[in-house]
Amino acid sequence: NMEHPGVEDFYRLPVSGGTPEKLTTMKGANEVTLSPDEKWLAIRFSFINKPWELYLQENKSGATPQQITNSVSEEFNSYRWRTPEVISFKNRSGNEVFARLYKPVNADPNKPAVIFVHGAGYLQNAHYWWSQYFREYMFHNLLADKGYTVLDIDYQGSSGYGRTCRTNIYRHMGGADLNDQVDGAKLLVEKYGVNPKAIGIYGGSYGGFMTLMAMFTQPEVFKAGAALRSVT
């Protein structure tokens, strides 16, 4: 993730040290296995709106990967899945926070929005590959179809952003991580024209816990919430 925290590439580095040489070219996640003779790369690749497929590429910089599997159905391809923007904003502490933003083509007149809180705390979801939250990704497409703006935040405690981000919630869960949701709601209002009286929040597991904390402690920000399989 040298180029962006939401992109995974494969690099070659001499044993003696030096400058890493990037071998992969596809933006997303590249999970690489070397062939026994080290002449080929087997790449398990996905993008935001494209599930995992297998590619083969020569083990050299600039080589063109060739797709060798096609696993999705005609039904899947019949829908125009969105590529949400991967954005970043500064939270109240000055930390850069990454998020996925789904913008409706035809916004509901009430300008509503939904904030999604991923689970575990230590996961990463504001990235450029196919999410393990693919069901929520599909739901967010539906919400955008219905005129909602959706924000999916990698809040404090999420993985992929270094030690400080991971430890900012130490001994105070529902503090700095919840602040990021509130700051995200503020961003939606100030930058994207969302109605401040029409913002909801939802999530499962740790995201359910965060939803409960939001509803109990920030009712002036979030007008509705759905806490799924909450950690209590």
Predicted segments, located by residue:
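Flexible, solvent-exposed coil segments and beta strand-coil junctions
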Residues: R12-V15, S78-Y79
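Surface loop/turn motifs at the tips and blade-to-blade linkers of beta-strand repeat domains
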Residues: L23-K27, N70
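Serine-hydrolase catalytic core recognition
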Residues: E31-T232
